[in-house]
Each structure stands twice: as structure tokens, then as C-alpha cells.
Swiss-Prot record:
Pfam families: Ribosomal_S9. Disulfide bonds: none annotated. The lineage of its organism: Bacteria, Bacillati, Bacillota, Bacilli, Lactobacillales. The gene is rpsI. This is Small ribosomal subunit protein uS9. One of its GO terms (cellular component) is cytosolic small ribosomal subunit.
């Protein structure tokens, strides 16, 4: 018999995470590596677990993540968004606490583009009056 899986897709900055939740012990695997190997910073790893803490489902699901694009923070944010969406499939009653914690909202902030004539998005060379 096929194992029960819950899927969710999360996005943040340039990162896209495809998340699968499988009933288990709380293992997190990102791109075939353990989360400790994939994301070296504990504070960013803690961010991933927020949806489980809000819904009180910590250590009830194994998380399998395929993520690409962006850096550590973007990928962690995308994974968090994907986990929150997958938890909605588990139980639609989770919508209220997840929404209240702001975990279902896609963070729309993106990198501002570089403008011609400037060194970066907003950095200009020093202004000389005379």
C-alpha cells in the first residue's frame, strides 16, 4: 500500500521549495542531505520548524524537500512556506493558527534591480556641487 504524503510548494526571493510531509519522527532531508549538513546555521534551521511549533505537530512528520535557487535564508523561507502549505493538507483546521503566525503569506520582497548610471540599486557616486 502506498504511504500517505502531503505536498506543498513554497517560494521566497529566488528560491522554490517542493515539500513532502510523511508521517514519521521529525527528520528533515533537503536535497538528499540532512538539514544540519545543508544549512550550517542553527538560527536559520530553527526558522524551518516554525509551522510545526505553531500547529503543535513537532516530530510527527518527516520532511523531504527539493529546493533550488537563492541562498540559505531564501531556501529556508521557501521551505517554511512549503511546510505550512503541506500542513494545510494534513488538517484544514491548521489554517487559522498558520495564518495568524503569517506562515501562509508569500513574502513578496525581492531584490531591487540595479539602475543604469548607479553603482548598485541605489548607491550613486558622491555628489559634487561644484
Amino acid at each position: 500500500m502506498a504511504q500517505v504524503q502531503y505536498r506543498g510548494t513554497g517560494r521566497r526571493k529566488d528560491s522554490v521549495a517542493r515539500v513532502r510531509l510523511v508521517p514519521g519522527t521529525g527528520k528533515i532531508v533537503m536535497n538528499d542531505k540532512s538539514v544540519e549538513d545543508y544549512i550550517p546555521f542553527a538560527d536559520i534551521r530553527k526558522e524551518l520548524l516554525q509551522p510545526f511549533e505553531v500547529t503543535e505537530t513537532t516530530d510527527q512528520y518527516d520532511v523531504l524537500v527539493n529546493v533550488n535557487g537563492g541562498g540559505f535564508h531564501g531556501q529556508a523561507g521557501a521551505t517554511r512556506h512549503g511546510i505550512a502549505r503541506a500542513l494545510l493538507e494534513v488538517d484544514p483546521d491548521f489554517r487559522t493558527p498558520l495564518k495568524r503566525a503569517g506562515l501562509l503569506t508569500r513574502d513578496a520582497r525581492m531584490k531591487e534591480r540595479k539602475k543604469p548610471g548607479l553603482k548598485k540599486a541605489r548607491k550613486a557616486s558622491q555628489f559634487s556641487k561644484r
